[in-house]
A protein has these predicted regions:
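Amphipathic alpha-helical assembly segments used for oligomerization, scaffolding, or translocation
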Residues: 1-145
């Protein structure tokens, strides 16, 4: 009977220790996951803000060209240039439909990542069309009489 009581007394503290260790591991896992999730969210928000700034800069470059050199070149008429097709190409470049700015409006990490991807596409669009518009402006200016 003493042996039975002794083994029961030894098992009970071991069981309590095991439960406490498991509880500590679970709590640490939950806090670790939350910290990881928060870090991912913060990184996504920061990336979206950077992408938004890139779109703003690319849009400004495009608008400066449209309102500056492209506007002056578009004011020319066919009599003012040697090759009238350069004016047609310029007008075609000026009539493109601009992308709609969506911004960083999201509630979760996936939403911010999606918004970042869209903003990066918009920045690329503005950069590409700024270059093609500049080429069209240069062609009109080279064709001036």
């Amino acid at each position: 009977m003493k042996a039975l009581r002794r083994s029961t007394c030894l098992r009970r503290p071991l069981a309590i220790i095991a439960v406490v260790v498991v509880a500590i591991i679970v709590v640490a896992g939950v806090f670790g996951f939350r910290a990881y999730s928060d870090a991912q969210y913060n990184n996504a928000v920061a990336a979206c803000a950077t992408a938004s700034e890139n779109v703003r800069n690319a849009t400004n470059d495009y608008n400066n060209l449209v309102n500056g050199d492209a506007s002056e070149a578009a004011a020319l008429i066919k009599k003012d240039v040697k090759d009238a097709s350069t004016l047609d190409a310029l007008n075609k470049e000026l009539s493109v439909e601009l992308p709609v700015y969506e911004g960083c409006v999201a509630d979760d990490t996936a939403g911010f990542k999606s918004a970042t991807a869209k903003l990066n596409e918009q920045a690329d669009w503005y950069k590409a069309y700024t270059q093609s518009l500049q080429k069209a402006v240069d062609a009109v200016n080279a064709s001036k009489k």
